[in-house]
UniProtKB/Swiss-Prot annotation:
The gene coding this protein: groES
Name of the protein: Co-chaperonin GroES
One GO BP annotation of this record: chaperone cofactor-dependent protein refolding
Organismal lineage: Bacteria, Pseudomonadati, Pseudomonadota, Alphaproteobacteria, Rhodobacterales
SMART domains according to UniProt: Cpn10
Keywords: Chaperone, Cytoplasm
Subcellular location: Cytoplasm
Length: 95
């Protein structure tokens, strides 16, 4: 299913966290927190200034990003859990 976010919204796929610690301990599902890191899958056209001028998004498809723990709305598209969030919820791009 194709999905195109509107305005300054971004579709993000969470990056899976490691199931083992560096010391080799396996982390059970009940103890895992959802990662606050993801990959941008789709980007809207951008926000608009009061004058109506379009502000281009700072992120692009494929960017790896860091976002707040409670950011976005969870959705399932084609059986994959994703997040839709405003661009302002993104803290930065990981390079």
């Amino acid at each position: 299913m194709a999905f195109k976010p509107l305005h300054d919204r971004v579709l993000v796929k969470r990056v899976q966290s490691e199931e083992k610690t560096k010391g080799g301990l396996i982390i059970p599902d009940t103890a895992k927190e959802k990662p606050a890191e993801g990959e941008v899958v789709a980007v809207g056209a951008g926000a608009r200034k009061d004058s109506g001028e379009l502000i281009a998004p700072a992120v692009a498809v494929g960017d790896r990003i860091l976002f707040g723990k409670w950011s976005g709305t969870e959705v399932t598209l084609d059986g994959v859990e994703m997040l839709i969030m405003k661009e302002s919820d993104i803290m930065g791009i990981i390079s």
